[in-house]
């Protein structure tokens, strides 16, 4: 990769959440293997991000590569309208078998945000088919559900990266963010705000949509499982649908295959993505119950009104099948448990740093919340110099490594975080 390539990149290519007039530096990756990203100058960085929660098996995994190479020789893509194929059938069979009952109807889509859009459309069309004008969603403050318009409408309008769009989006209902922590005691008072909104708007609400146990990009907050039990009970009592957005938490990240399992509940609609293909291809899935699917199908339209061009892409489905086969081997449970123990031990010293507000760990997620926002460019440069890839944002320095990470690799990540929080120059004050 030449200097001209990098200059073109900075001049013409938009990166996620980056300015075109003052772009953040980018680091040229030429290959990746295991838990390492290899830069064009030969430096190897231990990946602490799993490419945003996705590459749970690491990079260049032989099983994933073999599945995709085999599939591409047969067909890389074919439309899903009026056509089906073995990779999609196998994938949906696996998903129905592994997700909480009674989820049994699967809609395949392109990305996590689209999976959320699909879930919201399902909820709205469900109530339309029942002849009820329910058009609002109830969710938490500090939540994040994606970057498309519907998904943005259920992200916190005041405390998220989408606050710019407040006033342009449908006005949904936002309960106070959960305060009862995953590692703490349940506080009954936590439910008051949620219960009040439900009581006041029960006849308007199409669905409750939440990120189970872990609020992701909205703050990396980990809350008590009792919340899920209470919400499930309230939704059942009121006849309101429950959507679980497990785009980030699904497939083992929290120590359970799905975060809903921490409370032993099942949603009416479940959104999956990110790790679905082991981080190799873009693919998502939205699952729902037979009752929801048949109600929609028996409505005025006679079908669910959605159909992406690349729905059920065979190449992505083949990758997903291989990824799920790796998970089915069972090794991930011990891997995630070992990562959790190491993260708890090795991030504990960060609690004593003046710039640190909180440290929290669950499964293969380690979060250091700081008292001041990070200086992204300076801190990113420091991490690269330390031989690690960590992408902080706001007041969060967090780790979500591939499950296959070696103890010595994880130690490099935690050591870099501990060194970073001791240096006040990495923070905006």
Swiss-Prot record:
Activity regulation, short description: Inhibited by amiclenomycin. S-adenosyl-L-(2-hydroxy-4-methylthio)butyric acid and adenosine are competitive inhibitors with SAM and uncompetitive inhibitors with KAPA as substrates. S-adenosyl-L-ethionine, adenine and 8-keto-7-aminopelargonic acid are non-competitive inhibitors with both substrates.
Enzyme class: transferase
Site keyed Participates in the substrate recognition with KAPA and in a stacking interaction with the adenine ring of SAM: positions: 17
Effect of residue 253 to M: Loss of aminotransferase activity
Highest taxon in the source lineage: Bacteria
Pathway stated in the Swiss-Prot or TrEMBL entry: Cofactor biosynthesis; biotin biosynthesis; 7,8-diaminononanoate from 8-amino-7-oxononanoate (SAM route): step 1/1
Keywords annotated in UniProt: Aminotransferase, Biotin biosynthesis, Cytoplasm, Pyridoxal phosphate, S-adenosyl-L-methionine, Transferase
Residue positions binding substrate: 52, 144, 274, 307, 391
Entry's Gene Ontology cellular component terms: cytoplasm
Catalysed reaction, written as an equation: (8S)-8-amino-7-oxononanoate + S-adenosyl-L-methionine = S-adenosyl-4-methylsulfanyl-2-oxobutanoate + (7R,8S)-7,8-diammoniononanoate
GO biological processes: biotin biosynthetic process
CDD domains named in the record: OAT_like
One Gene Ontology molecular-function label: protein homodimerization activity
Effect of residue 144 to F: Severely reduces the aminotransferase activity
Phenotype upon loss of function: Loss of biotin synthesis.
Impact reported for residue 253 to Q: Increases aminotransferase activity toward SAM
InterPro entries: Aminotrans_3, Aminotrans_3_PPA_site, BioA, PyrdxlP-dep_Trfase, PyrdxlP-dep_Trfase_major, PyrdxlP-dep_Trfase_small
Places the protein is found: Cytoplasm
Subunit structure: Homodimer.
Matches recorded under HAMAP family: BioA (MF_00834)
Family under the similarity heading: Belongs to the class-III pyridoxal-phosphate-dependent aminotransferase family. BioA subfamily.
Name the record gives this protein: Adenosylmethionine-8-amino-7-oxononanoate aminotransferase
Organism: Escherichia coli (strain K12)
Recorded name of the encoding gene: bioA
């Amino acid at each position: 990769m030449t200097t001209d390539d990098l200059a073109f990149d900075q001049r013409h290519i938009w990166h996620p959440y980056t300015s075109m007039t003052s772009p953040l530096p980018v680091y040229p990756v030429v290959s990746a293997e295991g838990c390492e990203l290899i830069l064009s100058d030969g430096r190897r960085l231990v990946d602490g991000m799993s490419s945003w929660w996705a590459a749970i098996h690491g990079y260049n995994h032989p099983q994933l590569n073999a599945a995709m190479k085999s599939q591409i020789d047969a067909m890389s893509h074919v439309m899903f309208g009026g056509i089906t194929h073995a990779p999609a059938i196998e994938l949906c069979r696996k998903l129905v078998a592994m997700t909480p009952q009674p989820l049994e109807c699967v809609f395949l889509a392109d990305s996590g945000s689209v999976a959320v859009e699909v879930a919201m459309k399902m909820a709205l069309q469900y109530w339309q088919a029942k002849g009820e004008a329910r058009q609002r969603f109830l969710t938490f403050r500090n939540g994040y559900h994606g970057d498309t318009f519907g998904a943005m409408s259920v992200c916190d309008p005041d405390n998220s990266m989408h606050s710019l769009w407040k006033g342009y989006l449908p006005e949904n209902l936002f309960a106070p963010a959960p305060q009862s922590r995953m590692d703490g005691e349940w506080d009954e008072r936590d439910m008051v705000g949620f219960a009040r909104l439900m009581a006041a708007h029960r006849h308007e609400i199409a669905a409750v949509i939440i990120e189970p146990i872990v609020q992701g990009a909205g703050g990396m907050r980990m809350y008590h499982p009792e919340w899920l039990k209470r919400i499930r009970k309230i939704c059942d009592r009121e006849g309101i649908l429950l959507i679980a957005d497990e785009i980030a938490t699904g497939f083992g990240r929290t120590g359970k295959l799905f975060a809903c399992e921490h409370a032993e509940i099942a949603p009416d609609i479940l959104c999956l993505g990110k790790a679905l293909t082991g981080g190799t291809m873009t693919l998502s899935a939205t699952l729902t119950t037979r009752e929801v699917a048949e109600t929609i199908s028996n409505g005025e339209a006679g079908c669910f009104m959605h159909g992406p061009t690349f729905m059920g892409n065979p190449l992505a489905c083949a990758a997903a099948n291989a990824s799920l086969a790796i998970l089915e081997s069972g090794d991930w449970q011990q891997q995630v448990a070992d990562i959790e123990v190491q993260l708890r031990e090795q991030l504990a010293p960060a609690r004593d740093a003046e710039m640190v507000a909180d440290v929290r760990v669950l499964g293969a997620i380690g979060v250091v919340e700081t008292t001041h926002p990070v200086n992204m460019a300076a801190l990113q440069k420091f991490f690269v110099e330390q031989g690690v890839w960590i992408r902080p944002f706001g007041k969060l320095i967090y780790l979500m490594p591939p499950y296959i990470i070696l103890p010595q690799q994880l130690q490099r990540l935690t050591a870099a975080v501990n060194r970073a929080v001791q240096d006040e120059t990495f923070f905006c004050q």
